[in-house]
């Protein structure tokens, strides 16, 4: 049968001839000079039915069967060789020529080591708090990686190994997060992280409220006692256009550094961070109290609770006459330290001698060196007055330390003046003016100069002399203040012992600040946009919430460890992935001892208690009270 006896074959020959003519025409026309300076483009549509007329370019192979056949042949040959080698290795192993380790090594194409540590525990906690779901709900994106996923990675990094944004991708690639999230480490580059910070910034208040409320409800946190304090985080750089990074005063921070301030409320139950607000570094501590009181009152009213069910504990920088009236206006109870600044306050602080305090111990142990006596203080501002219950506390250890330090400084000053007197008559110390100048320099450099009276004079024989003595009256007046401080409250039902014990617990919020600056490394700040600084501060606050919440839950299970100690205990855990030549993979954990197994079981029990608590639409059941300190009710959320 003639293979060209079909219409398709005839058409194929016709197509070949057509293309030959086109090619010949192109060669002919290329040697002829164009007769017009411009040519108009020819517009048209070429239609070709491949199924009916055949291929438009018949010299191209429609099916690359040769390449496919070669590929299949090579795969078959490789599999055949591998099977032969496997059989040969098996025979050698059975004969004892090869060890099992050599066989396993031959069957292993590669091995990968992923850092795991405390990642499963912390990731499960964040999933229990629904951090990823809440952020994705408010910050939608069409990207393959949601903003909630990126935020969770940032939070985990702050908890385990705080790094700059540009190093996050490398860190993810070394951990088991790649397998857990099913995403490549390159997805978490610094540009994507910055976009996430920009995306969550408009929703920071809403996101924090919902995440924080998840923790309060699922862990049943007691909100009857709230601690409030302010801290500062140092920033590096110029920040010329920043509204937050400013110069200002803050304790234990250098005055020549720009800083960002944070006002934080923390629960006495577990020291969990609650409501917070970041402010300019130039903001004074007392200026933050008014807005904080408004935020607290608004939140409590929104949840249907009376403000007087909670008591706010603050340090002495958080109280003056105006603030005392604001507490009264909002109906909030408070217990705060007070710096004696008025004549009435100083008179109350020094009213009793040390001997008169010894009959009024306020510590839990009667032998403890803490004493207190009560009184009243009236605060007046803008024509309004409020009277508060006051407690003068004498801390014996603090008093003894202050007096011991003062005596050491007096002894050092006495030695300096004696050394100066021994050099009188030497060059530059031959006139009363020069000697007095040297005395003044030493007094100015000493912190106890107010207790020493020094005199330079000429003797009857015409010799220079220097004498000094301790001002016993000034020293006795100063010792009257040693180890003493004032506490004031508008809760008249609390005893002196309850006031003292509750105020000593206020270091809970200071522990939050310590964790933020040491473990989470919030400071120093390197971001230069206020929006990203605020968003990164939110990431750190969620990390702090997870840190303190996990610590509270495991300690309630009887595991007396901090979260940092737990992370260090789990640090050696790793995931080993073995890849075989046939494409199969084997995942296994590094060996776990019995003690670590027991720890993980307690941690799992702690997380299970929260996992099964469902947060309803109303979030908080009303009327949930139990006894707390004294007669004050305990509020459970």
Task: Put a short name on every predicted segment.
Residues 8-9, 19, 56, 72, ...:
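Intrinsic disorder/low-structure terminal segments
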Residues 9-12, 46, 58-61, 69, ...:
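Intrinsically disordered, low-complexity regions enriched in Ser/Pro/Gly/Gln/His and often acidic
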Residues 11-17, 23-24, 624, 629, ...:
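Leucine-biased recognition of intrinsically disordered, low-complexity hydrophobic segments
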Residues 17-25, 31-33, 603, 607, ...:
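N-terminal regions of proteins, emphasizing targeting and processing segments when present
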Residues 90-94, 102-121, 129-637:
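Anion-binding and metal-coordination hotspots
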